[in-house]
Amino acid sequence: MTKDKEPIVKSFHFVCLMIIIVGTRIQFSDGNEFAVDKSKRGLIHVPKDLPLKTKVLDMSQNYIAELQVSDMSFLSELTVLRLSHNRIQLLDLSVFKFNQDLEYLDLSHNQLQKISCHPIVSFRHLDLSFNDFKALPICKEFGNLSQLNFLGLSAMKLQKLDLLPIAHLHLSYILLDLRNYYIKENETESLQILNAKTLHLVFHPTSLFAIQVNISVNTLGCLQLTNIKLNDDNCQVFIKFLSELTRGSTLLNFTLNHIETTWKCLVRVFQFLWPKPVEYLNIYNLTIIESIREEDFTYSKTTLKALTIEHITNQVFLFSQTALYTVFSEMNIMMLTISDTPFIHMLCPHAPSTFKFLNFTQNVFTDSIFEKCSTLVKLETLILQKNGLKDLFKVGLMTKDMPSLEILDVSWNSLESGRHKENCTWVESIVVLNLSSNMLTDSVFRCLPPRIKVLDLHSNKIKSVPKQVVKLEALQELNVAFNSLTDLPGCGSFSSLSVLIIDHNSVSHPSADFFQSCQKMRSIKAGDNPFQCTCELREFVKNIDQVSSEVLEGWPDSYKCDYPESYRGSPLKDFHMSELSCNITLLIVTIGATMLVLAVTVTSLCIYLDLPWYLRMVCQWTQTRRRARNIPLEELQRNLQFHAFISYSEHDSAWVKSELVPYLEKEDIQICLHERNFVPGKSIVENIINCIEKSYKSIFVLSPNFVQSEWCHYELYFAHHNLFHEGSNNLILILLEPIPQNSIPNKYHKLKALMTQRTYLQWPKEKSKRGLFWANIRAAFNMKLTLVTENNDVKS
C-alpha cells in the first residue's frame, strides 16, 4: 500500500541525519571484511589473540584503562575501532601509527583528560565527547584530516580560537559536550566554529540553563540542543544564547531534545524563532511545568514550514484548554505534528488556515475533533492514529468541510461501522484512506469515500466483501490483510484494482475466476492463508501458474496447504490432482466405459475359453460331490457294478472292441460301455456320471481322435473329479496314438495336466511288446472286488 506522506519536518531532519551517517559511517565494499565484537566482556586490556585481518573491532562497554602501541600495531588492516564506555584517561595518538587505514575511532564516554598528539591522516569519524577534558582536545595535526566528517568534543571551558587548527575543514557534524562546562558569572565566552553543517550541543541534564557563550558557525544548516532546563527567570538567557546561533541565513533545521520549560517560556521561544530563517522546528521529549496561562502570540510572517512536537509530559493538571490549544491551532505554518501527548482536543482555527499537513498521532482525541470545522480548507493530509475515535460515520462527517483533503489516516483507533442507517458522508477529494487496526466489519464497504484510490483495512474484523457495495471504480490498492476473509474479493466493484494485499486471512478456496475478473492486477499478496488443497483449488493453482512471479508476492514460499493432513505444509506449486478425480461427470463416464470394456472383454474371454462348458462341468461336479458326501464309503463300494468304464472316441472303437474289451472280459473284468450300459431316457452327462460312479476304474483311450471329441473330454473331466476315493489311482490312461501337445486346445487343460503328471500305457505297434502292455493292464485290476449286479446280486 502507498505510504502516507511524512511531514517535511521529519524529512528535513532525516536529511540532516543522513548527512551525519554518510559522513561518519564506514562502509566496505569488500565482502570478506572481518568484524570482531568484544563489547560487554569485562575486559581490562586489549586482547592479544585478535585476528590479524580484523577490520572492525568493537570493545565498547568494558574496563580498559589504557592503550599501548603493542595493543594495535599488529592490526594493520583495522578500519573501525569502538572504545566507548571504558575507563581510558590518557590518549596517545601514536598508538595508532601502525593503523594507517583507521577511519572510525569512538572514544566517547571515557575518562579522558589529556591527549598526546601525533600525525594522523585517515580519520573520517573521531568522537572524543563525554570525557573529562578541561579544554577542547584539538591537535594541530587535526588540520590534516581532510576527510574528517564527524568530530565529537568535550570541554569545561571554551576559548574563541580553540578550533582554529581545523578552521579550514568542512565538517558535516560537530558534537560538543558541555555537560561539565564551568559557568563564569557575568562573563561571556566566545567560540568560533567556522565550517560545519550540523552542530549538536549537549548540556547538563539537571542544571538550569545558564551558559553565556557566543557560538558562531558558518554554513550551519542543522542545530540540535540537548538537555535544556528553563523557567521564566532564565528564559531570556536561553533566547540570547540562541540569537547568536541563529544569526546566519543558512540555518533551516532546529531541534530541541529533552527540554523542560514553562508554558510561558516555550511560547517566548516560539515567538523568537517565528521571524527567523528556520524552516523546520523539532521538539522531542518536552516537559511543561508550573502553569499554563493564556499568552499573547503574534503570528507574523514566518519562513517556518513545519513544527514537530513528540512526547509531551504535562505536569500542570489545572489549566485553560483554550490557552494551550489556541497557540497551535492558529499557527500560520503548513505542517504541524503533535504526537504522543495527553492532548484531548484541538481547536478549529478561527480563520481559514494555512495547514496542509496535520499529524496528531497517539493523543486522546475523540469523535468530536474538528466537528463542523470549515477553516481547514487547504488541509491535504490528516493523521489521527492511536486516538479515541469510535464512529466511522462521524469521521466521514468531519471531512465534509475539508475540500482539499487527500490523505486520511485514522488507524489504531476503535472505529466501528454500521451504527447509522444514513449513508456516510465524505469529502470527495480523499484518495488515500487508512482504516487499519480498528473494529470494522463487512459494513465498512458501505461507508467509504467514492473516489478513493488507496484503502488500508488490514487488522479489522472483516469476513467478506458484500456484493451490494458502492462501486469504487477509482480504487487501485486494497489492503485487507489480517482479517477473516474466506475468499478473494473480485473486481466487480473495483474495476481499477491493481494491488491487493490479503495475506493472513481465512482464504481456503479462492475463486478460480479471480484473475479473469481482475485484469489490471499487477501485485497480489495472498500468502499465509489456510488453503485447502482439494479439487476446488485446482483451477486457482492452474491460473497462478499463468501469472508472473512479479505479480504474486511471496510465491511460492508463503502459499502452503493447510488441509488435508497429508498435504499440510506442502507448497501449492507442488499440489496436483487429476482431472478424473475432480470431474464427477468424467469419472462416471470413465467408470461406465471401463465397465463396458471389461464386460466385453470378459464375455469374449468366456467365449474364447469355452467358459459355459466349464460352468456346466462345475455344476455336474458339484452335484456329484453332494451325492458323494451323503453316501458312506462302504455303501459306495457295495454299489460298484463294473471293474472299469472305458472312454474312447468313436473313431477308435474298432481297436477297443477288437483288442481291449475282449482281453479284459476274458480276464473276468466287467466293463461299462456306453452303447450297452447307458440307460435310455437319461441325459448323456447323467449316464457318464452314473457309469463312472459304478466303476472302480476309468480307462481312457487317448488319441488325436479323443482330443477332438467333446464327450470324451466330459468323461475325462468327471473321472478326474471323482470323489469316491480321493487320493486313489482310479484313472488308467492308454495312449493309442501319439498326441502333440500343441494339438490339445487350451480349454482341455485337464488333459494336458494329466499327460504331464500321470503315467500312461502306450499301445505298442510291435506285437512282441504287447505282452508287457497286457501284463500292466492285468496288474491294474489285480484285487478282489465285490460287485453288485443290476438285480442287486453280489458277485466276486
From Swiss-Prot:
Disulfide bonds join C117-C139, C235-C265, C348-C373, C424-C447. Residues 521-575 form the LRRCT domain. Residues 32-586 are extracellular. Changing L128V: Impairs the ability to induce NF-kappa-B activation. LRR repeats lie at residues 54-77, 78-101, 102-122, 123-147, 148-168, 169-196, 197-219, 220-250, 251-277, 278-303, 304-330, 331-354, 355-378, 379-404, 405-429, 430-450, 451-474, 475-496, 497-520. Changing N690T: Impairs the ability to induce NF-kappa-B activation. GO terms for biological process: activation of NF-kappaB-inducing kinase activity; cellular response to amyloid-beta; cellular response to diacyl bacterial lipopeptide; cellular response to oxidised low-density lipoprotein particle stimulus; defense response to bacterium; detection of diacyl bacterial lipopeptide; immune response; inflammatory response. This is Toll-like receptor 6. The gene is TLR6. Residues 640-781 form the TIR domain.
